[in-house]
Amino acid sequence: MKDSNEQKFIGQRIPNGMLGDNYPRNMWWVAARSDEIKEKPVARWLLETPVVLYRLEDGTPAALYDRCPHRWAPLSEGHVEGDKIICPYHGMQFNSEGHCTKAPTQKMMPKTAQIPSFKVLERGAFLWIWMGDQDAIDCEPPDVSYQTDNDWTFLGGYYDVKANWVLIRENVMDLTHIAFLHKNTFKQNDWITAPDSYLDGETICYEQEFDLAPLSPCLLYTSPSPRDRG
């Protein structure tokens, strides 16, 4: 028998959050743009988890669970002193590993006075965070060094869309619609024919070749011109 809640959504598009958290956590996720995280802590909601991002005294990025274990106040509402982030409620101090190192009202810290910490790496123009098992980190974030290469022009920002984020993810992953819906924009027909796939152990693999195609006028006129960075 299927769970009654699950049964209700069979054959329907499942609203975000209705069946719980099923994000792949043991992988790198973009947490923020590098230039967003400066001297003040910044709050993020990542994978249904409150996270606070900040920088240590030497500029190294850090990430903690954004709740003080005492009264669950958001640490992102506090401030940073040296390498410590200070809770805005009772002034408890936490290091980048999530351990409480000082509480103004008591001399000894209980072992339970700690919160989860997350590995953060700065690569390209982004901060990447590992939200899963911190002992299972077995790879580096994707190589996006071109984002800070002087031979490239990189633009960053946010674009708010009033829609379920799942729809955007599905659209980006679905490349088969490009030749039909965007035929006057991208002029790319490589995805009309399904590529051959093969099994390598437990991994399904395929190879796809793309022909060079000229950009449409709308993309040419809306793309930024190269800048002389010399």
Per-region residue spans from a language model:
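Short, basic/aromatic beta-hairpin or loop at an interaction surface
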Residues: 22-25
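Rieske [2Fe-2S] iron-sulfur-binding domain
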Residues: 2-7, 11, 16-17, 30-153
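Phosphate/oxyanion-binding loops and surfaces in catalytic or ligand/nucleic-acid-binding neighborhoods
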Residues: 134, 175-178, 229
